């Protein structure tokens, strides 16, 4: 069974949204030390229930808040998306040092991320 492991919030003005979430929810938000403009969102202590997420500059107008589902085999999961009426909208690509990522639309048009963890991804 695949679990939701991450959320991502798009922002037209990342600094404004960071300030909003820090002040309203008390979340800790830090710039990611990676190859893209991205911020890590910590929603609470690791030992408590919940998930953390990320914040990125909005790149596509139809993307809202997106959840990411962890999958054991991304290629197999993408084949399942296609065979069950979904659509791959961003193909598999590497997130260096993290894993392999793709974005899909389900049968109702909802956008989800799918991630296969792989620290060797490059």
PLM segments and residue spans:
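N-terminal beta-strand motif that seeds the catalytic metal site of vicinal oxygen chelate
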Residues: 1-18, 65-69, 116-122
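Vicinal oxygen chelate
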Residues: 9, 30, 78-79, 84-122
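Short, charged/polar, Gly/Pro-enriched secondary-structure boundary elements
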Residues: 46-52, 109-112
